[in-house]
Amino acid sequence: GTFKDRLILEGDPHSILEGMAIAGYAVGADKGFIYVRGEYVLSIERLGKAIEQAKALGLLGSNIFGSGFSFDVEIRKGAGAYVCGEETGLIESIEGKRGEPRIKPPYPGTEGLYGKPTVVNNVETIANIPPILLNGPDWFRQFGTERCPGTKVFTLTGDINNKGLIEVPMGITLRRVIYEIGGGIPGGREFKMAQTGGTSGGCLPKELLDVPMDYFTLPEHGSALGSGALLIMDDSHCIVDIAECFMRFFEHESCGKCTPCREGTARLHEIVAKIARGEGKPGDLELLDELGSVMQVSSLCGLGQAAPVPIKTMLKYFRDEFEAHINDRLCPTGTCGI
Protein backbone atom coordinates (compact mmCIF):
# COMPACT_ATOMS: atom_id res chain seq x y z
CA GLY A 1 0.00 0.00 0.00
CA THR A 2 1.75 3.10 -1.25
CA PHE A 3 0.18 6.14 -2.85
CA LYS A 4 2.74 8.90 -2.26
CA ASP A 5 3.45 9.17 -6.00
CA ARG A 6 -0.24 9.63 -6.70
CA LEU A 7 -0.32 12.50 -4.19
CA ILE A 8 2.49 14.28 -6.05
CA LEU A 9 0.88 13.64 -9.44
CA GLU A 10 -2.46 15.03 -8.30
CA GLY A 11 -1.33 17.66 -5.79
CA ASP A 12 1.73 19.21 -7.44
CA PRO A 13 2.12 18.02 -11.04
CA HIS A 14 4.11 21.12 -12.00
CA SER A 15 6.95 20.05 -9.68
CA ILE A 16 7.31 16.90 -11.80
CA LEU A 17 7.25 18.79 -15.09
CA GLU A 18 9.80 21.33 -13.84
CA GLY A 19 12.04 18.58 -12.49
CA MET A 20 11.84 16.66 -15.77
CA ALA A 21 12.70 19.73 -17.82
CA ILE A 22 15.74 20.40 -15.63
CA ALA A 23 16.80 16.75 -15.83
CA GLY A 24 16.34 16.83 -19.60
CA TYR A 25 18.54 19.92 -19.86
CA ALA A 26 21.20 18.25 -17.69
CA VAL A 27 21.43 15.08 -19.78
CA GLY A 28 20.68 16.58 -23.19
CA ALA A 29 17.23 15.02 -23.66
CA ASP A 30 14.39 16.75 -25.50
CA LYS A 31 11.55 14.36 -24.67
CA GLY A 32 10.16 12.98 -21.43
CA PHE A 33 7.50 10.37 -20.70
CA ILE A 34 5.42 10.05 -17.55
CA TYR A 35 4.20 6.49 -17.05
CA VAL A 36 0.97 6.39 -15.01
CA ARG A 37 -1.40 3.57 -14.12
CA GLY A 38 -4.51 3.77 -16.27
CA GLU A 39 -6.67 3.50 -13.14
CA TYR A 40 -5.31 6.83 -11.86
CA VAL A 41 -7.88 8.87 -13.79
CA LEU A 42 -7.55 12.03 -11.68
CA SER A 43 -3.74 11.88 -11.82
CA ILE A 44 -3.81 11.66 -15.60
CA GLU A 45 -6.37 14.46 -15.87
CA ARG A 46 -4.44 16.88 -13.65
CA LEU A 47 -1.11 16.00 -15.20
CA GLY A 48 -2.53 16.61 -18.67
CA LYS A 49 -3.88 19.99 -17.60
CA ALA A 50 -0.52 20.91 -16.05
CA ILE A 51 1.27 20.04 -19.31
CA GLU A 52 -1.13 22.31 -21.23
CA GLN A 53 -0.54 25.15 -18.75
CA ALA A 54 3.24 24.73 -18.91
CA LYS A 55 3.20 24.83 -22.71
CA ALA A 56 0.98 27.94 -22.70
CA LEU A 57 3.46 29.70 -20.40
CA GLY A 58 6.47 28.62 -22.44
CA LEU A 59 7.78 26.30 -19.72
CA LEU A 60 7.61 23.32 -22.08
CA GLY A 61 7.92 23.06 -25.84
CA SER A 62 10.29 24.58 -28.38
CA ASN A 63 13.03 27.05 -27.45
CA ILE A 64 12.01 27.45 -23.79
CA PHE A 65 12.43 31.12 -22.78
CA GLY A 66 14.63 31.68 -25.82
CA SER A 67 17.28 29.40 -24.38
CA GLY A 68 17.61 27.23 -27.45
CA PHE A 69 16.58 24.25 -25.33
CA SER A 70 13.41 22.37 -26.24
CA PHE A 71 11.66 19.80 -24.08
CA ASP A 72 8.28 18.12 -24.32
CA VAL A 73 6.45 15.71 -22.03
CA GLU A 74 4.01 12.95 -22.93
CA ILE A 75 1.79 10.83 -20.66
CA ARG A 76 1.70 7.07 -21.23
CA LYS A 77 -0.90 4.93 -19.46
CA GLY A 78 -0.02 1.55 -18.01
CA ALA A 79 -2.27 -1.43 -17.28
CA GLY A 80 -1.20 -1.69 -13.64
CA ALA A 81 1.20 -4.64 -13.86
CA TYR A 82 3.50 -4.75 -10.83
CA VAL A 83 6.46 -5.84 -12.96
CA CYS A 84 6.31 -2.52 -14.83
CA GLY A 85 7.79 -0.91 -11.75
CA GLU A 86 11.05 -2.43 -13.00
CA GLU A 87 12.71 0.11 -15.29
CA THR A 88 13.10 -2.04 -18.40
CA GLY A 89 9.61 -3.53 -18.01
CA LEU A 90 8.33 0.04 -17.83
CA ILE A 91 10.25 0.94 -20.98
CA GLU A 92 8.80 -2.07 -22.83
CA SER A 93 5.29 -0.99 -21.80
CA ILE A 94 5.84 2.60 -22.97
CA GLU A 95 6.92 1.19 -26.34
CA GLY A 96 3.58 -0.62 -26.55
CA LYS A 97 4.94 -4.07 -25.84
CA ARG A 98 4.11 -6.55 -23.12
CA GLY A 99 5.49 -5.40 -19.77
CA GLU A 100 8.48 -7.70 -19.36
CA PRO A 101 12.01 -6.92 -18.18
CA ARG A 102 14.91 -6.88 -20.59
CA ILE A 103 18.18 -8.69 -20.14
CA LYS A 104 20.84 -6.31 -18.81
CA PRO A 105 23.29 -5.16 -20.04
CA PRO A 106 22.68 -3.06 -22.02
CA TYR A 107 21.32 -0.79 -19.31
CA PRO A 108 18.79 1.98 -20.01
CA GLY A 109 21.49 4.64 -19.64
CA THR A 110 23.13 3.15 -22.72
CA GLU A 111 20.21 1.69 -24.66
CA GLY A 112 16.74 2.34 -23.27
CA LEU A 113 13.51 3.70 -24.73
CA TYR A 114 13.42 3.18 -28.51
CA GLY A 115 17.08 2.15 -28.30
CA LYS A 116 18.21 5.55 -27.01
CA PRO A 117 20.00 6.40 -23.73
CA THR A 118 17.29 6.81 -21.11
CA VAL A 119 17.05 8.10 -17.54
CA VAL A 120 14.33 6.41 -15.45
CA ASN A 121 13.37 7.95 -12.11
CA ASN A 122 10.52 7.86 -9.62
CA VAL A 123 8.34 10.98 -9.51
CA GLU A 124 9.41 11.74 -5.92
CA THR A 125 13.03 11.94 -7.06
CA ILE A 126 12.12 14.22 -9.97
CA ALA A 127 9.96 16.46 -7.76
CA ASN A 128 12.94 16.99 -5.42
CA ILE A 129 15.08 18.56 -8.16
CA PRO A 130 13.54 22.09 -8.30
CA PRO A 131 13.68 22.85 -4.54
CA ILE A 132 17.25 21.54 -4.29
CA LEU A 133 18.39 23.78 -7.16
CA LEU A 134 16.44 26.71 -5.75
CA ASN A 135 17.65 26.41 -2.15
CA GLY A 136 20.98 24.66 -2.60
CA PRO A 137 22.41 21.34 -1.40
CA ASP A 138 23.19 22.65 2.11
CA TRP A 139 19.50 23.39 2.62
CA PHE A 140 18.62 19.83 1.62
CA ARG A 141 21.34 18.37 3.84
CA GLN A 142 19.99 20.05 6.96
CA PHE A 143 17.38 17.29 6.98
CA GLY A 144 18.14 13.62 7.53
CA THR A 145 21.54 12.14 8.29
CA GLU A 146 25.04 12.68 6.95
CA ARG A 147 24.91 9.49 4.88
CA CYS A 148 21.26 9.94 3.88
CA PRO A 149 20.34 13.62 3.71
CA GLY A 150 16.89 14.98 2.93
CA THR A 151 13.38 13.80 3.60
CA LYS A 152 11.29 10.83 2.54
CA VAL A 153 7.56 10.51 1.96
CA PHE A 154 6.01 7.43 3.57
CA THR A 155 2.56 5.90 3.30
CA LEU A 156 1.27 4.75 6.69
CA THR A 157 -1.23 1.90 6.41
CA GLY A 158 -2.44 -1.10 8.40
CA ASP A 159 -3.06 -1.22 12.14
CA ILE A 160 -2.21 2.36 13.03
CA ASN A 161 -4.38 5.20 14.30
CA ASN A 162 -3.22 7.94 11.93
CA LYS A 163 -3.16 6.51 8.43
CA GLY A 164 -1.98 8.55 5.47
CA LEU A 165 1.06 10.25 4.01
CA ILE A 166 3.91 11.72 6.03
CA GLU A 167 7.13 13.48 5.06
CA VAL A 168 9.89 12.88 7.59
CA PRO A 169 13.68 13.28 7.79
CA MET A 170 15.78 10.37 6.60
CA GLY A 171 16.99 8.24 9.49
CA ILE A 172 13.88 8.59 11.64
CA THR A 173 13.10 5.43 13.61
CA LEU A 174 10.09 3.18 13.19
CA ARG A 175 9.17 3.81 16.82
CA ARG A 176 8.87 7.57 16.29
CA VAL A 177 6.86 7.13 13.11
CA ILE A 178 4.44 4.64 14.65
CA TYR A 179 3.93 6.16 18.09
CA GLU A 180 4.66 9.89 17.72
CA ILE A 181 3.31 10.50 14.22
CA GLY A 182 1.06 7.52 13.64
CA GLY A 183 -0.60 7.72 17.04
CA GLY A 184 0.17 4.13 18.00
CA ILE A 185 -1.74 0.89 17.53
CA PRO A 186 -5.58 1.00 17.66
CA GLY A 187 -7.52 -0.70 20.45
CA GLY A 188 -4.56 -0.88 22.80
CA ARG A 189 -3.13 -3.87 20.97
CA GLU A 190 0.59 -4.64 20.73
CA PHE A 191 2.77 -3.88 17.72
CA LYS A 192 3.88 -7.04 15.95
CA MET A 193 5.39 -6.31 12.56
CA ALA A 194 6.23 -3.51 10.15
CA GLN A 195 6.84 -4.09 6.48
CA THR A 196 8.94 -1.34 4.92
CA GLY A 197 9.31 -0.62 1.23
CA GLY A 198 6.14 -2.15 -0.18
CA THR A 199 5.03 -5.72 -0.79
CA SER A 200 8.57 -6.82 -1.61
CA GLY A 201 10.01 -5.22 1.53
CA GLY A 202 11.26 -6.91 4.66
CA CYS A 203 9.09 -7.58 7.70
CA LEU A 204 10.60 -6.26 10.92
CA PRO A 205 9.73 -7.19 14.55
CA LYS A 206 9.36 -5.00 17.64
CA GLU A 207 13.03 -5.57 18.52
CA LEU A 208 13.93 -3.37 15.52
CA LEU A 209 11.62 -0.44 16.28
CA ASP A 210 14.62 1.80 16.96
CA VAL A 211 16.40 1.06 13.68
CA PRO A 212 16.96 4.24 11.59
CA MET A 213 15.03 4.16 8.34
CA ASP A 214 17.51 5.02 5.62
CA TYR A 215 19.03 3.49 2.50
CA PHE A 216 21.97 1.98 4.39
CA THR A 217 20.61 0.71 7.72
CA LEU A 218 17.43 -1.09 6.64
CA PRO A 219 19.26 -3.39 4.18
CA GLU A 220 21.48 -4.52 7.07
CA HIS A 221 18.33 -6.03 8.58
CA GLY A 222 16.97 -7.53 5.37
CA SER A 223 14.65 -4.72 4.33
CA ALA A 224 14.68 -1.48 2.32
CA LEU A 225 13.01 1.92 1.99
CA GLY A 226 11.72 1.02 -1.46
CA SER A 227 8.51 2.78 -2.43
CA GLY A 228 8.07 4.35 1.00
CA ALA A 229 5.22 2.06 2.04
CA LEU A 230 4.91 1.28 5.76
CA LEU A 231 2.48 -1.52 6.59
CA ILE A 232 1.90 -1.90 10.33
CA MET A 233 0.47 -5.11 11.82
CA ASP A 234 -0.70 -5.70 15.39
CA ASP A 235 -0.55 -8.92 17.41
CA SER A 236 -3.91 -10.20 16.14
CA HIS A 237 -2.35 -11.20 12.81
CA CYS A 238 -0.80 -14.53 11.92
CA ILE A 239 2.58 -14.23 10.23
CA VAL A 240 2.01 -17.37 8.14
CA ASP A 241 -1.32 -16.03 6.90
CA ILE A 242 0.32 -12.73 5.93
CA ALA A 243 3.13 -14.62 4.18
CA GLU A 244 0.60 -16.64 2.18
CA CYS A 245 -1.08 -13.40 1.06
CA PHE A 246 2.23 -11.88 -0.06
CA MET A 247 3.33 -15.01 -1.94
CA ARG A 248 -0.05 -15.29 -3.68
CA PHE A 249 0.43 -11.72 -4.89
CA PHE A 250 3.88 -12.42 -6.33
CA GLU A 251 2.75 -15.62 -8.04
CA HIS A 252 0.02 -13.59 -9.74
CA GLU A 253 2.27 -10.65 -10.66
CA SER A 254 5.22 -12.61 -12.07
CA CYS A 255 5.39 -11.94 -15.80
CA GLY A 256 6.63 -15.49 -16.38
CA LYS A 257 9.55 -14.55 -18.61
CA CYS A 258 12.26 -16.18 -16.48
CA THR A 259 12.04 -19.61 -14.87
CA PRO A 260 13.39 -18.72 -11.39
CA CYS A 261 10.65 -16.15 -10.82
CA ARG A 262 7.83 -17.95 -12.66
CA GLU A 263 8.37 -21.28 -10.92
CA GLY A 264 9.86 -19.86 -7.73
CA THR A 265 6.93 -17.63 -6.82
CA ALA A 266 4.52 -20.51 -7.47
CA ARG A 267 6.50 -22.89 -5.25
CA LEU A 268 6.89 -20.31 -2.47
CA HIS A 269 3.14 -19.77 -2.45
CA GLU A 270 2.43 -23.50 -2.61
CA ILE A 271 4.65 -24.31 0.39
CA VAL A 272 3.42 -21.41 2.55
CA ALA A 273 -0.22 -22.25 1.73
CA LYS A 274 0.35 -25.85 2.88
CA ILE A 275 1.88 -24.63 6.14
CA ALA A 276 -1.12 -22.33 6.69
CA ARG A 277 -3.48 -25.30 6.20
CA GLY A 278 -1.58 -27.37 8.75
CA GLU A 279 -0.02 -29.57 6.06
CA GLY A 280 3.56 -28.37 6.50
CA LYS A 281 6.36 -30.85 7.12
CA PRO A 282 9.90 -30.79 8.51
CA GLY A 283 12.29 -29.27 6.00
CA ASP A 284 9.75 -26.86 4.51
CA LEU A 285 11.28 -23.81 6.18
CA GLU A 286 14.75 -24.70 4.96
CA LEU A 287 13.33 -25.24 1.48
CA LEU A 288 11.63 -21.84 1.54
CA ASP A 289 14.87 -20.15 2.55
CA GLU A 290 16.94 -22.00 -0.05
CA LEU A 291 14.44 -21.39 -2.83
CA GLY A 292 14.32 -17.70 -1.95
CA SER A 293 18.11 -17.44 -2.08
CA VAL A 294 18.19 -19.08 -5.53
CA MET A 295 15.56 -16.65 -6.81
CA GLN A 296 17.51 -13.67 -5.50
CA VAL A 297 20.63 -14.54 -7.48
CA SER A 298 19.09 -15.99 -10.64
CA SER A 299 15.89 -14.05 -11.43
CA LEU A 300 16.01 -11.73 -14.41
CA CYS A 301 14.67 -8.62 -12.71
CA GLY A 302 13.95 -6.98 -9.38
CA LEU A 303 10.53 -8.60 -8.99
CA GLY A 304 11.89 -12.12 -8.77
CA GLN A 305 14.91 -10.99 -6.79
CA ALA A 306 12.77 -9.17 -4.21
CA ALA A 307 9.78 -11.54 -4.02
CA PRO A 308 11.48 -13.78 -1.41
CA VAL A 309 12.45 -10.84 0.85
CA PRO A 310 9.22 -10.84 2.92
CA ILE A 311 9.33 -14.60 3.52
CA LYS A 312 13.06 -14.64 4.29
CA THR A 313 12.72 -11.89 6.90
CA MET A 314 9.65 -13.59 8.37
CA LEU A 315 11.62 -16.81 8.72
CA LYS A 316 14.42 -14.85 10.40
CA TYR A 317 12.32 -12.88 12.87
CA PHE A 318 9.10 -14.91 13.27
CA ARG A 319 10.26 -18.49 12.75
CA ASP A 320 8.46 -19.70 15.89
CA GLU A 321 5.06 -19.09 14.27
CA PHE A 322 5.96 -21.18 11.24
CA GLU A 323 7.25 -23.94 13.52
CA ALA A 324 4.01 -23.88 15.54
CA HIS A 325 2.02 -24.46 12.35
CA ILE A 326 4.28 -27.34 11.29
CA ASN A 327 5.19 -29.07 14.55
CA ASP A 328 2.07 -28.42 16.65
CA ARG A 329 -0.50 -28.00 13.86
CA LEU A 330 -1.45 -24.81 15.69
CA CYS A 331 -1.98 -21.21 14.59
CA PRO A 332 -1.05 -19.07 17.63
CA THR A 333 -3.55 -16.34 16.68
CA GLY A 334 -6.32 -18.70 15.54
CA THR A 335 -6.37 -17.08 12.11
CA CYS A 336 -5.59 -20.11 9.97
CA GLY A 337 -8.29 -22.37 11.40
CA ILE A 338 -6.09 -25.40 12.03
Functional labels for PLM-detected ranges:
Residues 44-170, 182:
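Hydrophobic alpha-helical positions that pack around
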Residues 41, 158, 191-211:
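Short acidic beta-strand-loop surface patches of small beta-rich interaction domains
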Residues 32, 183-198:
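Short loop-to-beta-strand transition segments
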Residues 93-105, 207-224:
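Active-site loop ensemble at the mouth of alpha/beta enzyme cores that anchors a bound cofactor
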Residues 19-23, 171-186:
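Short amphipathic, charge-patterned alpha-helical segments
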Residues 1-2, 39-44, 81-84, 90, ...:
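Flexible loop/turn segments at secondary-structure boundaries
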Residues 5-9, 30-32, 36, 40, ...:
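Ferredoxin-type iron-sulfur electron-transfer modules in oxidoreductases and energy-metabolism complexes
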Residues 12-26:
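Histidine-anchored nucleotide/phosphate-binding helix
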